[in-house]
Amino acid sequence: IQAFVPRMIASGEEGHVINTSSGDGGVSPLPYQSVYASSKAAVSCITECLAAQLQTEQTKLGASIFYPSGGLLDTGIWTTDRNRPSDLAREKPYDPVPTVADFKVAAEAAGMQLDFQDLDELARFCLQGIRDKSFVIMIGIEEAEKTLQQRAGRIGRSELPIDLAEVPQL
């Protein structure tokens, strides 16, 4: 952010910062993905702060948080362990490493019907969100709103915010 936002502001032109997060962390974390969820929660939080700062300083820049959504995304995220240095290996590695198909089966076993989202369609949706000056860009934001309200209620009652009954088991 420090590397490019000051230069964008100095240009005097309109612009937009789009940060990609995940519903896993930005909306409701999966308990077995704590590092990933934590990093995505941080992306969501810093984007919220950045957007507020850009508005407060009356710049010509906006900022949005993009949650790739609308179904399962068949991307390289499912095989990231192949890039992990051996000295940073997981203490309890998955064996075998779950695939996107494995996750879909686990979700369906938990009563969730998941479909795949076309990545080109998702990119068009994201660009439209930027044009519309939406802060949160997410397919199915209404469902996320319900989840966030439920989490807020559990937090307000000093309960665990994660609804374990809704977590797919791998």
Question: Which residues does each predicted region cover?
Answer:
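A short, exposed helix-loop element centered on a Lys and neighboring polar residues
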Residues: I1-Q2, E48
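SDR active-site lid
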Residues: Q53-V136
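Conserved catalytic-site loops of classical short-chain dehydrogenases/reductases
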Residues: E14-T20, L61-F66
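Catalytic loop of short-chain dehydrogenase/reductase
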Residues: I9, I18-A42, T47-E48, A52-T56, ...
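Terminal hydrophobic/aromatic helix or amphipathic segment near a protein terminus
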Residues: V136-R157
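A structural motif corresponding to the C-terminal end of an alpha-helix
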Residues: A3-R7
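Non-catalytic terminal and boundary segments that flank Rossmann-like NAD(P)-dependent oxidoreductase
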Residues: R90-P93, G153-L170
